[in-house]
């Protein structure tokens, strides 16, 4: 295939122009070496990945303990929790015992992660883990399929072009090397649409595997807001529904209160109680224990300072517990005065709840609901009625944040994030700013691809990890009422910010703040808009993202195993702890759930990068496959060994499906931009690209809409609906677990027996009732420690047994 002189001159002129316009600073980090430095970055990442595995194997082996209880009580190693087996999180099944027997070699954990059966992982981690790994299977098979046309069709077409000279090794693998007169460009457009259709079919097949959960269909309870706070008699609410909706039977009415301070005091009180019990049991065996209670006591070994004086541990925690208990009781007495305008109303069956909900569906549009004789008292025309979430899904501390203040906080936080990320701190802008201040001049003089290519790809990966953490933690500041809504917002926010930070803005050459602002507000600069879109097809740009995917696949997944952030936070908290019970609590609280929302967002970000450049730079596809395989293995290990079982709303998984459907649309957009800029807006390929993009968008939106309709249909209760304890009649709930009531846990839990001898875990370790007193004391100490450290395990059993979700 030959190219005309115009093509050759245009190619050279285009490359020189776009390099100057896209990268206006000296830019050590955004311009590449021969073949984009890809081989060097790949080899260096492989070496670092092997090093990370070796380091992790040493750390994990050093902290290994199958008993786990003795490790938590007696081992102060900084790595004991982070890298040890989280055996307290799940019941010791035959599968777990078999895995422990096999997990004794230096790198046996690595091979166990590969050979582990899906059934073992699902039995331990729950149904959400099944949906997650099946989703990864679909992506892996899809990318494996598109590797064939990408490497077998598109790559040879690109490389055999003659627009660029033979010295441009990496550039010849991109679409820039194909002549504008070549009919083979039709294959690029056709395959971009084929990728979308294939991906859509895979996602549709994945959605069919979502089994409807009873926990989402069993609710007969409504959540009602804007109820007058002066209503204290539930009979008024019952009377209103009885008169306004004849035949409706209300079985339970729960009022809500502001319990933020009460929950905090209860946590502190329980920590003090655990400290007293621990040192009481220990004093009976070893005598009085002295501790230094200053947070910085570990920094100073001198006992002469007053603030570092040692005190009697048992007496200190007894006095602290007494003080906090008094404050707790005082706050508990004030709680009835802190009524919220929110109630939960449970009906006899779901049809009654559905009838009321339907009547209030259009209240905001001015449609009046049915009235009763007490309507003017309960002000039912102001109510907002929705189906109640599961009690375990509610974050009770956040219910006191009213909707107006909630929206004000939500808008303020996300506006700040928008300006922070879009205008100031996208990874490429940070890296380009480093260049502007001559920080990288010594690196530039080296002219070494190890530094000039590996360094920027590591920086880009690092910023795409650090910056979304800010987004991740911002979701907690927004004070969502339910964990499901919190996770759903988290997965969407992280993905949107990541795609703009990593894919869209850097691809268009918006790599410095001044260029970005000029692109937004300068009228004359906008006349050169075509130059910005040429940046998408700059060869160095493609190499930059190939290196990013390689780094995410190897070094990135290796760092997910190390979890240095968790280790740093844990070691810092442990360093400033004052006593052994506090360290026990720190270890217990460190056992967190697997963050599906965050992992979905990061995985979909890399998948979007791969799909965006799968046509214009096909060499990125096999590295995308490498990333998905490495991510799958890493997540299997982390879910099984490192995190607690997690229950989710299925909307989280559907959000990831929507993002996966959106990813190939970026490739269609990129193909359309190329056609407009290189072929003209009236060229047949341009018109075809625009048509396929519009068709793909329609298919995507229709598919997502039908998926939501299916979820709504699954949500609707069936005629023979399974009855759950929190929907039963009051007379039938005498033994109802308190965690299943629509009342904050801190208001309903019975008082604990505060003596170690009565600990329910006392005989967990096979202790005998007729043992000597010393044995009883030792058993009580160990049993109490087991009680302290098994909270996450008990929670996991409760959730698994009741098929609930967080």
Swiss-Prot record:
Region named Disordered: 755-781
Signal peptide: none
Molecular-function GO terms, alphabetical: calcium-activated cation channel activity; osmolarity-sensing monoatomic cation channel activity
Subcellular location: Endoplasmic reticulum membrane; Cell membrane
Record's keyword annotation contains Glycoprotein: no
Transmembrane segments: 38-62, 127-159, 183-207, 404-433, 449-478, 483-519, 543-575, 596-614, 618-642, 650-678, 684-704
Segments in the Cytoplasmic topological domain: 63-126, 208-403, 479-482, 576-595, 643-649, 705-806
Post-translational modification Phosphoserine, affected residues: 77, 80
Keyword Endoplasmic reticulum tagged: yes
Pfam families linked: PHM7_cyt, RSN1_7TM, RSN1_TM
BP GO terms, sorted: glomerular filtration; monoatomic cation transport
Membrane topology listed for this record: Multi-pass membrane protein
GO cellular component: endoplasmic reticulum membrane; lysosomal membrane; plasma membrane
Reported regulation of activity: Activated by hyperosmotic shock after mannitol treatment.
Record's keyword terms, sorted: Calcium, Cell membrane, Disease variant, Endoplasmic reticulum, Hereditary spastic paraplegia, Ion channel, Ion transport, Membrane, Neurodegeneration, Phosphoprotein, Transmembrane, Transmembrane helix, Transport
Main localization of the protein described in the UniProt heading: endoplasmic reticulum
Tissue specificity field: Expressed in podocytes of kidney glomeruli. Significantly reduced expression in patients with focal segmental glomerulosclerosis.
Residue intervals annotated with topology Extracellular: 1-37, 160-182, 434-448, 520-542, 615-617, 679-683
Catalytic activity from the UniProt record: Ca(2+)(in) = Ca(2+)(out)
Family of this protein: Belongs to the CSC1 (TC 1.A.17) family.
Disease: Spastic paraplegia 87, autosomal recessive: A form of spastic paraplegia, a neurodegenerative disorder characterized by a slow, gradual, progressive weakness and spasticity of the lower limbs. Rate of progression and the severity of symptoms are quite variable. Initial symptoms may include difficulty with balance, weakness and stiffness in the legs, muscle spasms, and dragging the toes when walking. In some forms of the disorder, bladder symptoms (such as incontinence) may appear, or the weakness and stiffness may spread to other parts of the body.
Entry function: Acts as an osmosensitive cation channel preferentially activated upon hypotonic stress. In contrast to TMEM63B, does not show phospholipid scramblase activity. Enriched in mitochondria-ER contact sites where it may regulate the metabolite flux and organelles' morphologies in response to osmotic changes. In particular may regulate mitochondrial motility and function in motor neuron axons. Required for the functional integrity of the kidney glomerular filtration barrier.
Subunit architecture: Monomer.
Protein name in the entry: Osmosensitive cation channel TMEM63C
Source species of the chain: Homo sapiens
Gene (name only): TMEM63C
